[in-house]
């Protein structure tokens, strides 16, 4: 007992420092590569327009689309969370990744075609076109920004902090602030194109580093068979606490689950019940993959629909890998370091990783620190930084788009392109400030399973949004009143579960939560199913009791009318969607433009450099403003969803092949 406590104390306080030349050289080379790609995209891409900054000019081909989808989804939270939950409970958490193989195809084949023909930049913007009014769009924008700041950013910050603590021993605040600063630089300067090119580079870095560590881990444990032979025996040697209130700890708290090798588990006693995993997770994944701004924005930047579908397929194939690159290495970490990763005594866990409820979240960082040689350890740090920066940059850019296009344009409907771009950049700076201010909260809340935390919060808030998007696309009869009250009713139900769970805490096996069973006993994915159908029923019921939306307002806004050639009359068309045209001076628009140009003094050299750095230089466009006819032609091209028949068949066959592979793997590990 005493020997282990002292060992835990040493592990908790003396970290392995990455201070050798090989590691430092690899890390420096990685950062130079990322910054170089960001600077290259500044020269190459058009960042001086709202479409260029927020949608990469609709010019991305399939492979950066797919790589960016994968890299934006796989953050440091996946390395820490998937490996940690794998260490704690086995293979089932990989179902979160393999479920996405089917949902990402729904995105490319069902949802994106409608988003394209609608001609929208953001998801709240689509709902405004579909239903009219302001309240749904504003509600969804605020909800999305809330989720970005308090779940996505907090999870990435926490998981990045765990890795930095374990691997570097640096001051956590200085390290994370430096990461945020570098991320902010290429987000602010490069726009979405910079993110998608750097995402592509970082995808290869992430996969290369993860493959190398997986090889070392399997070699150490005795191969694939060694993992399955030894995992059920990976038990900590310390099971007695000095705290009289805890005392002898039940074996159910530290023994690996008997069903650890199965994806599909008992519908009542399973940690991830199979009905909840198949249906409840699909609902939450549908929100994330088909209506979340971070993901959909990558698809909307695709060159055409065929490239978007191919990118979704590539992302699906990449999503096969986390089972073998994250979940299984997490299980191996428990086998190799059971007294640390599988600790159960609260005071020992506190010494090992700084939290009393368990240390499974250190599973992946512990492998890196213990197994990787010099140089490769630096590579893995670069991998984790790549994942953290990619995820944060995606959130910064997408939240900037939401705030600028959906909230700020309500306050300043006549704002010009330059004003919108400036506000978008300033919002990124604000998000960075909020992230840094949130660090103490994240550091103090190091309890429970990281992956369970983010999935449970999503399960309480996202299903109403999923229900409304599904009904908006596939049920033309649904109207604004039904959608709005469906969202509000679902929000109230979700908060009725979320608030008690946060108030009482989720607890642990050693110290269970005091949350009343009526609120907290139902598994969060089962609750997602209930919430989805209740919200959908409320939406349909209210829509049936109120006036329908005339079909003239629905052309190319619902799936059944996506190929309609009739002119659509947008609801609330009088509301300005973007920058207002220049004022007319004595009946002459050109005269007013000329007067504005005369009245604006030429910027100095320093200001010109700053404007170019932020993508706001007038000279960057190199051409006069487009005419009305050119704008209309560009709009028609961007909204085109026609496909080359031969390439469409190739893409469809690849989608069928990917689904076949997915079904086989689900069956093999079921």
Swiss-Prot record:
Bridged cysteine pairs (disulfide): 253-509, 343-349, 353-359, 515-520
Cytoplasmic compartment residues: 43-61, 113-134, 294-307, 405-422, 476-480, 546-649
Keyword Transport: yes
Regulation: Enhanced by the interaction with PDZK1IP1/MAP17.
Keyword field: Cell membrane, Disulfide bond, Glycoprotein, Ion transport, Membrane, Metal-binding, Sodium, Sodium transport, Sugar transport, Symport, Transmembrane, Transmembrane helix, Transport
Pfam families referenced in this protein's UniProt entry, alphabetically: SSF (PF00474)
Catalytic activity: D-glucose(out) + Na(+)(out) = D-glucose(in) + Na(+)(in)
Membrane association type: Multi-pass membrane protein
Cellular component GO terms, alphabetical: apical plasma membrane; brush border membrane; plasma membrane
Ranges facing Extracellular side: 1-20, 84-91, 165-171, 216-273, 330-373, 445-449, 504-521, 669-670
GO molecular function, one term: D-glucose:sodium symporter activity
Membrane-spanning intervals of the chain: 21-42, 62-83, 92-112, 135-164, 172-193, 194-215, 274-293, 308-329, 374-404, 423-444, 450-475, 481-503, 522-545, 650-668
Compartments, as annotated in UniProt: Apical cell membrane
Positions of Na(+) binding: 71, 74, 387, 390-391
Protein family membership: Belongs to the sodium:solute symporter (SSF) (TC 2.A.21) family.
SUBUNIT field: Forms a heterodimer (via TM13) with PDZK1IP1 (via N-terminal transmembrane helix); this interaction enhances SLC5A2 transporter activity.
Protein name: Sodium/glucose cotransporter 2
Organism: Rattus norvegicus
Gene responsible for this protein: Slc5a2
